[in-house]
Design a protein with these regions (language model features):
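N-terminal transmembrane-helix/juxtamembrane module of multi-pass inner/ER membrane proteins
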Residues: 2-87, 124-142
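Membrane-interface helix-loop-helix junctions at transmembrane boundaries of multi-pass membrane enzymes
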Residues: 20-29, 99-108, 174-178
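Interfacial segments of alpha-helical transmembrane regions
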Residues: 31-38, 92-117
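Alpha-helical transmembrane segments of multi-pass membrane proteins, especially transporters
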Residues: 62, 107-112, 206-210
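Hydrophobic alpha-helical transmembrane segments
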Residues: 80-100, 156-160, 166
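Hydrophobic alpha-helical transmembrane segments of polytopic
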Residues: 88, 92, 112, 180-187
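Transmembrane alpha-helix/helix-exit interface in multi-pass inner-membrane proteins
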Residues: 112-130
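Membrane-embedded catalytic cores of phosphoryl/pyrophosphoryl-handling enzymes
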Residues: 135-245
Length: 245
């Protein structure tokens, strides 16, 4: 009986190891392809930022700012209102910790604040000029550079990770699940338009900012899944050993 249990345990262990190798092979290939696509997109976006003439950026901003109806300015300010990265992340992390979601809290912090920090460093590197009030309407003048947009990068990394957590953790039949997912997706989609409308960034800043955020979000999600997978495998082996005692 003991020998049979040992054989079954060894078979399960070998099966887990095989599945792990197969999963890593597929996962590694997908990771390389995704990283290459994002890198190519980022290079293209950087070229767009460097080569697009100022006249085009000014015309695009004025076209967006020509749209006017009651409440639009307030709505755009609301969309951009979650851009204070440290405060927003701290509040959410406290909520996740209270729900015993320590792993999610850690990676949300790494994704949100990490993306924001990277964007701030790149701003100093590129030192590109922001829109000025002599050519477009500027609702608030920031002292930092225009590219990349810290708001865009933060929104993609932070709300993108929250989207992943909500999709994974909220029950499929919950009435709040679609509402939460749509809200997060809309915030990510509209923040670029809001920054353009408020005269905070040029149109050429947006593609690279979205792609930079997508790259860092992908890295954080990949690490999160690897950590979660390792913990699940350890738990499976522990339960298997306990079951054969």
């Amino acid at each position: 009986m003991f020998d049979t249990n040992v054989m079954l345990l060894k078979r399960n262990r070998d099966s887990v190891a095989f599945n792990k190798r197969e999963g890593l092979t597929r996962s590694s290939f997908a990771a390389v392809v995704t990283a290459c696509l994002i890198a190519a997109g980022a290079a293209f976006a950087l070229l767009v930022h460097l080569l697009v003439p100022l006249s085009f950026n000014v015309a695009a901003t004025l076209a967006v700012q020509s749209i006017s109806f009651p409440g639009l300015q307030e709505f755009m300010r609301l969309v951009s209102g979650f851009g204070n990265a440290p405060k927003v992340v701290i509040i959410t992390v406290i909520a996740l910790m209270a729900c015993n979601k320590r792993r999610e809290a850690f990676f949300l912090t790494a994704s949100g604040l990490g993306g924001w920090f990277i964007a701030m460093q790149l701003k100093h590197l590129f030192a590109s000029a922001r829109p000025t009030s002599d050519v477009v309407n500027v609702f608030h003048q920031w002292p930092t550079g225009s590219f990349p947009s810290g708001h865009l990068v933060f929104y993609v990394c932070y709300f993108g990770f929250l989207y992943f957590i909500a999709r994974e953790k909220l029950p499929a039949k919950s009435i709040f699940r679609p509402l939460v997912l749509v809200t997060l997706a809309v915030l990510i989609a509209l923040v670029g338009l809001s920054r353009l409308y408020l005269g905070e960034h040029w149109l050429s800043d947006l593609p690279g900012s979205y792609l930079l955020g997508a790259f860092w979000l992908y890295v954080c999600l990949k690490l999160y899944r690897l950590w979660a997978g390792a913990r699940d495998r350890q738990r499976f082996m522990a339960e298997s050993i306990a079951g054969y005692r």
